[in-house]
């Protein structure tokens, strides 16, 4: 469950290490984002020679949450922290590698590229 001002780790190789959620997209009153939702983020911590710089604003898709995601069979998939993958204006991943597992809920038309790059799909 991600809301405005939430800090997230970055699960790709764009050079960003930490981002801050500045908006949850999908309606004017929408408060929370879960796995598979798109948010606007600001880069708070970045590697010196990375593809992105500190202070830049990007779209991102949430790939892991500590709150977890409930499946249809009643199981709950939780992670140790919150993580996102940075996206460009066409909602394609900026990075060429994904670090850590992602959930099966990302397996939609829009995010198949992220699922195929991920080392593990839970």
UniProtKB/Swiss-Prot annotation:
According to its UniProt entry, the protein's GO biological process terms are: translation
Q: Which GO terms describe its cellular component?
A: cytosolic large ribosomal subunit
Q: Write down the SUPFAM superfamilies for this protein, in alphabetical order.
A: Ribosomal protein L14
InterPro entries xref list: Ribosomal_uL14, Ribosomal_uL14_bac-type, Ribosomal_uL14_CS, Ribosomal_uL14_sf
Question: Could you give a GO molecular-function term held by this entry?
Answer: large ribosomal subunit rRNA binding
Question: What are the record keywords, sorted?
Answer: Ribonucleoprotein, Ribosomal protein, RNA-binding, rRNA-binding
What the entry lists under Pfam families is as follows: Ribosomal_L14
Q: How is the quaternary structure described?
A: Part of the 50S ribosomal subunit. Forms a cluster with proteins L3 and L19. In the 70S ribosome, L14 and L19 interact and together make contacts with the 16S rRNA in bridges B5 and B8.
UniProt family annotation = Belongs to the universal ribosomal protein uL14 family.
Query: What job does this protein perform?
Result: Binds to 23S rRNA. Forms part of two intersubunit bridges in the 70S ribosome.
Read off the HAMAP family from this record.
Ribosomal_uL14 (MF_01367)
Q: Which PANTHER family match?
A: 50S/60S RIBOSOMAL PROTEIN L14/L23, LARGE RIBOSOMAL SUBUNIT PROTEIN UL14M
Task: From the Swiss-Prot or TrEMBL record, give the protein name.
Answer: Large ribosomal subunit protein uL14
């Amino acid at each position: 469950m991600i809301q405005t001002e939430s800090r997230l780790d970055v699960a790709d190789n764009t050079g960003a290490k930490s981002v801050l959620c500045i908006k949850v997209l999908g309606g004017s009153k929408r408060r929370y984002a879960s796995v598979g939702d798109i948010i606007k983020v600001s880069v708070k911590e970045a590697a010196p020679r990375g593809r992105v710089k500190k202070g830049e604003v990007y779209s991102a898709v949430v790939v892991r949450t500590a709150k977890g995601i409930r499946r249809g069979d009643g199981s709950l998939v939780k992670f140790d922290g919150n993580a996102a993958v940075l996206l460009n204006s066409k909602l394609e991943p900026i990075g060429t590698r994904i670090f850590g597992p992602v959930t099966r809920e990302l397996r939609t038309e829009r995010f198949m590229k992220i699922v195929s790059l991920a080392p593990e799909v839970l």
